[in-house]
Amino acid sequence: MQERHTEQDYRALLIADTPIIDVRAPIEFEQGAMPAAINLPLMNNDERAAVGTCYKQQGSDAALALGHKLVAGEIRQQRMDAWRAACLQNPQGILCCARGGQRSHIVQSWLHAAGIDYPLVEGGYKALRQTAIQATIELAQKPIVLIGGCTGSGKTLLVQQQPNGVDLEGLARHRGSAFGRTLQPQLSQASFENLLAAEMLKTDARQNLRLWVLEDESRMIGSNHLPECLRERMTQAAIAVVEDPFEIRLERLNEEYFLRMHHDFTHAYGDEQGWQEYCEYLHHGLSAIKRRLGLQRYNELAARLDAALTTQLTTGSTDGHLAWLVPLLEEYYDPMYRYQLEKKAEKVVFRGEWAEVAEWVKAR
């Protein structure tokens, strides 16, 4: 059983999306995990807490004995069955605990006794986490081109289509605005950073990467924030601004926020509940900027949103949403973005419609 413990080994694990059987407790996994990890804990949260208390009060030997007592009999067999199945399903995988200590070694020895030799991560999650942090710091030093533009300019799609593009919003599972949530819950901050590091490592490994193409994001993307090392580099980066006609932007927003979100909600929840979730999603987005709109203007737009939803429900048409979307863009989102762009005008190196910016980026 060969353990992997060099920096290059850790990076190779992330680049290859090597399946990781993470045997830490669920609470630890939720706080931060690697992208390709599945959580099959040696101890659940309560068992881990009990063993931790025992360790503090009575020492390591007593804690180890308690752990073996808690994970015994049918409980141990159930967990063994899960580990065995995961090992057989992921023969190229690897075991991981917090620091490559007792938990992963215990599971490894139990599997060995059952006839399965499976490697473990020496240094555990902590070593992988440090590798992810260091990789982001290093890779962020490469030149960056940011794709800017008003809401609905197709910036995310443009980034996605570049071989050296990294979709920060996709990784964060959020589109960055008040209406930015998706049906996928956002990851913990550590898990988001790990996912970002893995994506940057994989993208860099696929080619002789000269520069990154990223969307011009603020520090926060929903509840996740960009690593400071990357954010600092982005503040110094050149910006290419997409300037598409207003009507084209409206078409994109209609497709993304009304047609697609309605489809996604009904697909996930069924027609009736999906419709309610979709309505709540739009109202929540508008409510999030109530103070900035002012109460009177918010109430006017909320009433128009209600009318648009009624029309959509009865006719299937999303055209009614223009009655609140157009003023929201003209009075709030567009002025806000233009103000932000003015503050970094010296960083703008190219302006053009979507296809022109895409061609310019391709030539870099």
UniProtKB/Swiss-Prot annotation:
Top-rank taxon: Bacteria
Reaction equation(s) it catalyzes: 5-methylaminomethyl-2-thiouridine(34) in tRNA + selenophosphate + (2E)-geranyl diphosphate + H2O + H(+) = 5-methylaminomethyl-2-selenouridine(34) in tRNA + (2E)-thiogeraniol + phosphate + diphosphate; 5-methylaminomethyl-2-thiouridine(34) in tRNA + (2E)-geranyl diphosphate = 5-methylaminomethyl-S-(2E)-geranyl-thiouridine(34) in tRNA + diphosphate; 5-methylaminomethyl-S-(2E)-geranyl-thiouridine(34) in tRNA + selenophosphate + H(+) = 5-methylaminomethyl-2-(Se-phospho)selenouridine(34) in tRNA + (2E)-thiogeraniol; 5-methylaminomethyl-2-(Se-phospho)selenouridine(34) in tRNA + H2O = 5-methylaminomethyl-2-selenouridine(34) in tRNA + phosphate
The keyword Transferase is annotated on this UniProt entry: yes
UniProt keyword terms in alphabetical order: Selenium, Transferase
InterPro entries for this protein: Rhodanese-like_dom (IPR001763), Rhodanese-like_dom_sf (IPR036873), SelU (IPR017582)
UniProt GO MF annotations: transferase activity, transferring alkyl or aryl (other than methyl) groups; tRNA 2-selenouridine synthase activity
Residue ranges of domain Rhodanese in the record: 14-137
E.C. numbers: 2.9.1.3
Family in the record: Belongs to the SelU family.
Function: Involved in the post-transcriptional modification of the uridine at the wobble position (U34) of tRNA(Lys), tRNA(Glu) and tRNA(Gln). Catalyzes the conversion of 2-thiouridine (S2U-RNA) to 2-selenouridine (Se2U-RNA). Acts in a two-step process involving geranylation of 2-thiouridine (S2U) to S-geranyl-2-thiouridine (geS2U) and subsequent selenation of the latter derivative to 2-selenouridine (Se2U) in the tRNA chain.
PANTHER family, per database record: TRNA 2-SELENOURIDINE SYNTHASE
Protein name: tRNA 2-selenouridine synthase
Species name: Shigella dysenteriae serotype 1 (strain Sd197)
Gene behind this protein: selU
